[in-house]
Protein backbone atom coordinates (compact mmCIF):
# COMPACT_ATOMS: atom_id res chain seq x y z
CA UNK A 1 0.00 0.00 0.00
CA UNK A 2 1.33 3.44 -0.94
CA UNK A 3 0.89 6.30 1.48
CA UNK A 4 2.42 9.52 2.69
CA UNK A 5 2.12 11.34 6.00
CA UNK A 6 1.51 15.04 6.48
CA UNK A 7 1.80 17.78 9.08
CA UNK A 8 0.65 21.41 9.07
CA UNK A 9 3.71 23.62 9.42
CA UNK A 10 2.85 25.49 12.61
CA UNK A 11 5.80 26.35 14.88
CA UNK A 12 4.32 24.32 17.73
CA UNK A 13 4.30 21.23 15.46
CA UNK A 14 7.99 21.33 14.56
CA UNK A 15 9.36 19.15 17.37
CA UNK A 16 6.64 16.53 16.86
CA UNK A 17 7.24 16.59 13.10
CA UNK A 18 10.95 15.96 13.68
CA UNK A 19 10.13 13.01 15.93
CA UNK A 20 7.67 11.70 13.37
CA UNK A 21 10.26 11.90 10.58
CA UNK A 22 12.73 10.00 12.76
CA UNK A 23 10.18 7.26 13.45
CA UNK A 24 8.87 6.87 9.90
CA UNK A 25 10.55 4.59 7.43
CA UNK A 26 12.81 6.55 5.07
CA UNK A 27 10.59 5.18 2.27
CA UNK A 28 7.59 7.14 3.60
CA UNK A 29 7.35 10.73 2.42
CA UNK A 30 6.56 13.23 5.17
CA UNK A 31 4.99 16.32 3.64
CA UNK A 32 4.55 19.66 5.32
CA UNK A 33 1.62 21.90 4.44
CA UNK A 34 2.18 25.60 4.90
CA UNK A 35 -0.35 26.83 7.45
CA UNK A 36 -3.12 28.85 5.85
CA UNK A 37 -2.46 32.57 6.10
CA UNK A 38 1.01 32.11 7.57
CA UNK A 39 4.13 33.76 6.17
CA UNK A 40 7.38 31.89 6.79
CA UNK A 41 10.75 33.50 7.35
CA UNK A 42 13.62 31.92 5.45
CA UNK A 43 14.84 30.34 8.69
CA UNK A 44 11.41 28.83 9.41
CA UNK A 45 11.13 27.58 5.84
CA UNK A 46 14.57 25.98 6.16
CA UNK A 47 13.41 24.05 9.25
CA UNK A 48 10.41 22.67 7.36
CA UNK A 49 12.41 22.04 4.18
CA UNK A 50 14.82 19.91 6.21
CA UNK A 51 11.84 17.59 6.81
CA UNK A 52 10.17 18.03 3.41
CA UNK A 53 12.40 19.01 0.50
CA UNK A 54 9.25 19.93 -1.45
CA UNK A 55 7.97 22.39 1.20
CA UNK A 56 8.81 25.28 -1.11
CA UNK A 57 5.82 24.40 -3.31
CA UNK A 58 3.51 24.83 -0.31
CA UNK A 59 5.19 27.88 1.24
CA UNK A 60 3.51 30.50 -0.96
CA UNK A 61 0.26 30.62 -2.90
CA UNK A 62 0.62 30.15 -6.64
CA UNK A 63 -0.65 32.72 -9.11
CA UNK A 64 -3.20 30.81 -11.15
CA UNK A 65 -5.58 33.19 -12.95
CA UNK A 66 -5.55 32.49 -16.66
CA UNK A 67 -2.96 29.73 -16.34
CA UNK A 68 -3.37 26.28 -17.85
CA UNK A 69 -4.76 23.76 -15.40
CA UNK A 70 -5.66 20.10 -15.83
CA UNK A 71 -8.86 20.48 -13.81
CA UNK A 72 -12.02 20.24 -15.85
CA UNK A 73 -10.28 18.21 -18.53
CA UNK A 74 -8.47 15.21 -17.04
CA UNK A 75 -9.20 15.99 -13.37
CA UNK A 76 -12.53 16.70 -11.68
CA UNK A 77 -13.93 17.00 -8.17
CA UNK A 78 -17.05 14.98 -7.36
CA UNK A 79 -19.41 15.52 -4.42
CA UNK A 80 -21.26 12.62 -2.82
CA UNK A 81 -24.45 13.44 -4.72
CA UNK A 82 -22.55 13.18 -8.01
CA UNK A 83 -22.14 16.90 -8.64
CA UNK A 84 -19.02 17.37 -10.76
CA UNK A 85 -16.89 20.49 -10.58
CA UNK A 86 -13.64 21.15 -12.37
CA UNK A 87 -11.89 21.78 -9.04
CA UNK A 88 -12.73 21.52 -5.37
CA UNK A 89 -12.17 25.29 -5.11
CA UNK A 90 -14.18 26.39 -8.17
CA UNK A 91 -17.93 26.40 -7.40
CA UNK A 92 -19.18 26.21 -11.01
CA UNK A 93 -20.86 22.86 -11.68
CA UNK A 94 -20.05 20.88 -14.82
CA UNK A 95 -22.92 18.43 -14.43
CA UNK A 96 -23.54 15.14 -12.68
CA UNK A 97 -21.47 11.98 -12.57
CA UNK A 98 -24.46 9.65 -12.36
CA UNK A 99 -26.35 10.96 -15.38
CA UNK A 100 -23.20 11.70 -17.40
CA UNK A 101 -24.15 15.34 -17.99
CA UNK A 102 -20.67 16.54 -16.99
CA UNK A 103 -18.98 14.86 -19.99
CA UNK A 104 -20.06 17.49 -22.53
CA UNK A 105 -18.39 20.20 -20.44
CA UNK A 106 -14.99 18.56 -20.06
CA UNK A 107 -12.17 20.34 -21.80
CA UNK A 108 -9.07 22.44 -21.34
CA UNK A 109 -9.57 25.80 -19.69
CA UNK A 110 -7.57 28.31 -17.73
CA UNK A 111 -7.90 28.68 -13.98
CA UNK A 112 -10.50 31.29 -12.99
CA UNK A 113 -9.04 31.90 -9.51
CA UNK A 114 -6.42 34.56 -8.77
CA UNK A 115 -4.30 32.24 -6.61
CA UNK A 116 -4.21 28.61 -5.61
CA UNK A 117 -2.81 27.75 -2.20
CA UNK A 118 -3.76 24.13 -1.61
CA UNK A 119 -1.95 21.05 -2.92
CA UNK A 120 -5.12 19.42 -4.25
CA UNK A 121 -5.56 22.44 -6.51
CA UNK A 122 -2.12 23.76 -7.47
CA UNK A 123 -0.74 20.28 -8.14
CA UNK A 124 -2.76 20.40 -11.38
CA UNK A 125 -1.37 23.72 -12.64
CA UNK A 126 0.55 22.98 -15.81
CA UNK A 127 3.02 25.75 -14.97
CA UNK A 128 4.36 23.70 -12.04
CA UNK A 129 6.41 20.48 -12.35
CA UNK A 130 4.40 18.64 -9.72
CA UNK A 131 3.16 15.80 -11.94
CA UNK A 132 6.83 14.90 -12.33
CA UNK A 133 7.78 15.57 -8.69
CA UNK A 134 4.87 13.45 -7.42
CA UNK A 135 4.94 10.87 -10.21
CA UNK A 136 4.40 8.12 -7.63
CA UNK A 137 0.93 9.53 -6.83
CA UNK A 138 -0.11 13.10 -7.50
CA UNK A 139 -2.95 13.47 -5.01
CA UNK A 140 -1.44 11.05 -2.52
CA UNK A 141 1.79 13.06 -2.55
CA UNK A 142 3.98 10.13 -3.39
CA UNK A 143 7.20 11.53 -4.86
CA UNK A 144 8.88 10.01 -7.87
CA UNK A 145 11.12 7.30 -6.42
CA UNK A 146 14.07 8.77 -8.31
CA UNK A 147 13.76 12.09 -6.41
CA UNK A 148 15.13 11.95 -2.84
CA UNK A 149 12.59 13.00 -0.21
CA UNK A 150 14.52 12.37 2.97
CA UNK A 151 17.72 13.83 4.30
Indicate where each model-derived feature is located.
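Flexible mid-to-C-terminal extensions adjoining Fe-S/redox cofactors in radical SAM and related proteins
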Residues: 83-151
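Radical SAM enzyme [4Fe-4S]-AdoMet core and its adjacent flexible, acidic
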Residues: 1-81, 85, 89, 95, ...
Amino acid sequence: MRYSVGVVGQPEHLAAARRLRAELSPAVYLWINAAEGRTYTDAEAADWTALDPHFGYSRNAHLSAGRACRTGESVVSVDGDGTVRRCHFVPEELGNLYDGSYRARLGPRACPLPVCDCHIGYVHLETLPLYEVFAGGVLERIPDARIPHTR
